[in-house]
């Protein structure tokens, strides 16, 4: 993965508002399709990787960039497990010896973990409610475009379905009355959302708010990941393990 250090302007205000005290560096990662964040507990640094579109038009993708900074804030205030997935040495070895097996298991963990964005967006909404409204509008427009183009394969991807569940959960969690009911939109186009996805939307909606007490919040994270993996019928047994100063994931 090639990346180049960049110095975007105007983001310091968001870092300051979030109270970030660890250095944040920004990197242009042309091969990335979306923005990405890596929080390193050992070096006490944050890296925010910007996709080409985010670098060229930061105002359009500001919700995503600030979202990544909120990941950094949770990493500092709770743990890096809320921003970056790390694995036990056992699974690091599997990644080298059995890359196919690791890739499949790691993807399942990511899908079971990605609702961490609910808590990230709780923090973003507290400071900048207009950004979640912008993000919801953009996401809804994207879904409508997929419908118009009959992109059924993209609509049925796990990432899209979990995004729909999160979108629906946040509509009610944050009282976003102007945010589109995408389940209804899909139904109007003859597409019925699976019960398990609707169930996940309800589950996400009622996720406990973080208390910013690491042990308790990590337990909430772990139990929710276990539950999502169960609902999605993934053959993994995710568990957070404290190793060498880091909370890392073991998959059984």
Give the location of each predicted region:
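Residues that form generic nucleotide/phosphate-binding pockets
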Residues: 17, 123, 228-231
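Post-HEXXH active-site segment of zinc metalloproteases
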Residues: 59, 74-112
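Pan-zinc metallopeptidase signature
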Residues: 133-252
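Generic structural signal for hydrophobic core residues of well-folded globular domains
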Residues: 69, 73, 77, 115, ...
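Active-site scaffold of zinc-dependent metalloenzymes
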Residues: 25-65, 69-86, 245-252
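Long amphipathic alpha-helical segments with strong coiled-coil/leucine-zipper propensity
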Residues: 96-152
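Non-catalytic, well-ordered alpha-helical scaffold segments
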Residues: 63, 117-118, 155-159
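Zn2+-dependent metallopeptidase catalytic core
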Residues: 1-23
């Amino acid at each position: 993965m090639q990346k180049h250090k960049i110095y975007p302007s105007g983001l310091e205000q968001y870092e300051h508002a979030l109270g970030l005290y660890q250095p944040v560096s920004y990197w242009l990662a042309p091969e990335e399709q979306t923005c990405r964040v890596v929080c390193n507990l050992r070096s006490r640094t944050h890296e925010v990787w910007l996709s080409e579109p985010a670098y060229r038009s930061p105002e359009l993708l500001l919700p995503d960039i600030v979202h990544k900074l909120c990941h950094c804030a949770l990493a500092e205030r709770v743990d890096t497990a809320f921003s970056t997935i790390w694995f036990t040495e056992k699974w690091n070895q599997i990644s080298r010896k059995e890359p196919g097996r690791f890739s499949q298991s790691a993807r399942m963990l990511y899908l079971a973990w990605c609702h961490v964005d609910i808590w990230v967006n709780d923090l973003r909404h507290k400071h900048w409610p207009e950004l979640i409204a912008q993000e919801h509008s953009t996401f809804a427009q994207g879904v409508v475009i997929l419908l118009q183009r009959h992109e059924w394969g993209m609509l049925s991807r796990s990432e899209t379905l979990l995004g729909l569940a999160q979108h629906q959960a946040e509509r009610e969690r944050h009282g976003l009355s102007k945010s589109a009911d995408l389940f209804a939109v899909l139904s109007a186009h003859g597409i019925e959302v699976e019960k398990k996805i609707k169930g996940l939307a309800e589950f996400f909606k009622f996720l406990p708010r973080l208390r910013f007490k690491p042990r308790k919040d990590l337990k909430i994270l772990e139990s929710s990941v276990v539950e999502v993996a169960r609902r999605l019928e993934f053959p993994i047994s995710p568990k957070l393990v404290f190793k060498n100063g880091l909370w890392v994931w073991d998959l059984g």
